[in-house]
Amino acid sequence: MLNRTILVGRLTRDPELRTTQSGVNVASFTLAVNRTFTNAQGEREADFINIIVFKKQAENVNKYLSKGSLAGVDGRLQTRNYENKEGQRVYVTEVVADSIQFLEPKNTDDNQQDLYQQQAQQTRGQSQYSNNKPVKDNPFANANCPIEIDDNDLPF
């Protein structure tokens, strides 16, 4: 028997971190995962999947992920039930994460802002070293030019 779930999507809200009575950290969040097909209007629909993660990974998720973050989740599907205040049986299906991959840098906006500020300072005639930040060269600046690679240099 196999119970394994692999998902890639964006968080719909900031993670919620709490601690169990036994002292174990638990983080929960919802992941929006696009379906591979489109509906009749040609739009992609998404599934909103509840995720829970424990211990140190729960702390890391709470620290490094936020609403809109892209994450990969590898875990197992779990269904649990409880009785609510009205005495009704409630069933909850969620993914218990074994590992979570942070698929984009935490400070993407900050990095882009730094690059923009460096470029603006350079165009005003200031030295690129005046702000003591490393210069971020664009490795794809000449992407529209053909790349000269000898067939013997290819690994396949």
UniProtKB/Swiss-Prot annotation:
GO terms for molecular function: single-stranded DNA binding. CDD domains: SSB_OBF. SUPFAM superfamilies: Nucleic acid-binding proteins. It comes from the Bacteria. Residues 122-146 are annotated as: Disordered. Homotetramer. This is Single-stranded DNA-binding protein 1.
